[in-house]
Swiss-Prot record:
Region of interest: Disordered: 178-199
Catalytic activity of the protein: isochorismate + 2-oxoglutarate + H(+) = 5-enolpyruvoyl-6-hydroxy-2-succinyl-cyclohex-3-ene-1-carboxylate + CO2
Known pathway: Quinol/quinone metabolism; 1,4-dihydroxy-2-naphthoate biosynthesis; 1,4-dihydroxy-2-naphthoate from chorismate: step 2/7; Quinol/quinone metabolism; menaquinone biosynthesis
Molecular-function GO term, any one: thiamine pyrophosphate binding
Name this polypeptide is given: 2-succinyl-5-enolpyruvyl-6-hydroxy-3-cyclohexene-1-carboxylate synthase
Entry keyword annotation includes Glycoprotein: no
Homology family: Belongs to the TPP enzyme family. MenD subfamily.
Cofactor names: Mg(2+); Mn(2+); thiamine diphosphate
The organism of origin for this protein: Roseiflexus castenholzii (strain DSM 13941 / HLO8)
Pfam families: TPP_enzyme_C, TPP_enzyme_M_2, TPP_enzyme_N
């Protein structure tokens, strides 16, 4: 080892890899040189180089979303670390495992006016589950200091990936020399205390058993409630667990006779039989459904305001929320039973205790769902083509196992309204923790890097695209081909749905904020093929060609926000008129 900094960084990074870290995003700088070299030289860790810290952090967030394991992001000192903050907020709010490693100046330079030096100790506050200001490397470290680096790495991975999942911040100060040059008085060979275990295992193994079935004391009261009420719902919000959960939801719906209403980014919308996705259209109107007597909830707070409003029409329903993380997610404050348990284990334990129910209630939802999608399909064929139609067609055209990222603001709501459930399994993602429009492109590309064998599509609005155009550099730099659908209504189209739209000129000038940008230039600069489309035939052709070729393509559909809203409302009214 040339010097103390390289020894410390190499020991820490080696143990992170042994604890399961496989992906890291590196932003260039000087103070983080020991960390950059340690990560770049480790054979078990895939390294992604980014020029910009904000994009790097969101890309790492996407990696963690795609792999369901912690990803790391590394930067130098100063405002570079502050640029991690938006992604860290999203990771905390959404329960995504993320490691933030920030290099820092030594303690004697803090609060001294030294260049590129800010207070980085616990700088992410309550948005980090664990923050550590790591000790400065020493020339002749005692064995316990080196063992601490390995247990620190193991603990960081365990906390980020445990329940509730979230952010771990390691702040690492270094004195020069930062490069791998010899330093007089430093150890020339790693001491025994720095060595890993001979068998390749982590220095500290955090062993988690498979989630046990909830005890009878938990299951029996819930089963009794469900048996008493025929008019119930299963509701799956964003960020439901993967694995067997979706199939178990379908089975539970069949057993209870409760329709399963699933959010577009719940992980249960696409690929699971019998789920309901057209609820926004048929719950209200002339053929409105009566409120449920019991609601069994999974996942985070719903995207759909209409579904939330419908659930709130119940006078005093039983609302049971099951969540392994134990994190509260009920902004209506209607939950009567909060169950902290592994969701799949809970359903497995519950199903045998229920009598299978042939339910006219569930059948009414199934029939309404069929009528809704028939009306939607007929309406989308009409001109002019609009944003919701494009989202419907993306779902129709994506192949089995594809990755889909939907941007916040309108696209995620379009997915909830126009993303038809189907037999093909599509992994749909969105940043619904803090629901910001920043970093969406970078998150999408991180997802593509984390699922390299799956085609990647992203649907974003023009303001979202503008916010993260620099993230497009990862298409070439990190080798992530993506089909990006840009729904360009020249400003903040979502504000047309709010009462402020009646107040001009402030509405246009300060809310819609039309920009008139030509995004073809951005596509050219970042090496994407640019395909402008105006109608459904052109869109479907361009999208299918890009996905089939695994090409890097920007498909731009220019729309008018007012026309889009009129088309959407007319389509919903037409669907309701069918009796759905």
């Amino acid at each position: 080892m040339p010097n103390r900094n390289i020894l410390y960084a190499t020991t820490l990074v080696d143990e992170l890899a042994r604890a399961g870290l496989r992906h890291v995003c590196l932003a260039p700088g000087s103070r983080n040189t020991p960390l950059v070299l340690a990560f770049a030289r480790h054979p078990a860790i895939r390294v992604f180089s980014h020029l910009d810290e904000r994009s790097a952090a969101f890309f790492a967030l996407g990696l963690a979303l795609a792999t369901d394991t912690p990803a790391a992001v590394v930067c130098t000192s100063g405002s570079a670390a502050a640029n991690f903050f938006p992604a860290i907020v999203e990771a905390h709010q959404a329960g995504v495992p993320l490691l933030a490693l920030t290099a820092d100046r030594p303690h004697e330079l803090r609060d001294s006016g030294a260049n590129q030096t800010i207070d980085q100790v616990k700088m992410f506050g309550s948005f980090a589950r664990w923050s550590v200001d790591v000790a400065l490397p020493e020339a002749m470290p005692p064995p316990v200091a080196l063992r601490n680096l390995r247990t620190l790495a193991a603990r960081a991975m365990a906390i980020a990936g445990g329940e509730p999942r979230g952010v771990v911040h390691l702040n690492l100060p270094f004195r020069p020399p930062l490069e791998p040059t010899p330093m007089p008085g430093d150890l020339t060979e790693p001491p025994a205390a720095a060595q890993p275990r001979d068998d390749g295992a982590p220095y500290t193994c955090f062993l988690r058993s498979a989630p046990p079935a909830p005890p009878e004391a938990v299951i029996e009261p819930i089963a009794a409630v469900l048996e008493q009420h025929e008019r119930g719902l299963i509701v799956c919000g964003p960020r439901c667990p993967g694995g067997a959960f979706g199939a178990l939801v379908s089975e539970l719906s069949q057993r209870t006779g409760y329709p399963a209403l699933v959010d577009g980014v719940s992980g249960v919308r696409f690929g699971y039989p019998g789920v309901i996705g057209g609820y926004e259209t048929f719950l209200f109107g002339e053929h409105a459904f009566p409120p449920p007597e019991v609601v069994l909830r999974f996942g985070a707070v719903l995207t759909s305001k209409w579904l939330n409003q419908y659930l709130d029409t119940a006078a005093s329903p039983v609302v049971i929320h099951v969540r392994a993380s134990g994190v509260w997610a009920d902004d209506s404050h209607r939950v009567s039973h909060f169950v902290v348990a592994d969701e799949a284990a809970f359903i497995r334990a519950l199903i045998p205790r229920l009598t299978e129910r042939q339910s006219a209630w569930r059948q009414r939802f199934v029939e309404a769902e069929a009528r809704v999608w028939a009306a939607v399909e007929a309406g989308i064929a009409d001109e002019p083509y609009f944003d919701g139609g494009a989202v419907y067609d993306v779902i129709d055209l994506l192949p089995e196992g594809a990755s889909l990222f939907v941007g916040n603001s309108l696209p995620v709501r379009h997915l909830d309204q126009f993303g038809k459930p189907g037999v093909r399994h599509i992994c749909a993602f969105a940043n619904r923790g803090a629901s910001g429009i920043d970093g969406n492109i970078s998150t999408a590309l991180g997802i593509g890097a984390g699922r390299p064998d799956a085609p990647l599509a992203a649907i974003v609005g023009d303001i979202t695209f503008y916010h993260d155009m620099n993230g497009l550099l990862a298409v070439r730099r990190c080798g992530v081909p993506a089909t990006i659908v840009l729904l360009n209504n020249d400003g903040g189209g979502i504000f047309h749905r709010l009462p402020i739209n009646r107040f001009e000129p402030e509405f246009t000038d300060y809310f819609v904020t039309p920009h008139g940008l030509d995004f073809a230039h951005a596509a050219k600069m970042y090496g994407l093929e640019y395909v402008p489309v105006k109608d459904r035939t052109a869109f479907r052709s361009a999208f299918r060609a890009s996905i089939d070729a695994r090409a890097a393509t920007l498909i731009e559909l220019r729309t008018d926000a007012r026309t889009d809203l009129v088309r959407r409302n007319a389509l919903i009214q037409a669907a309701r008129a069918t009796g759905a």
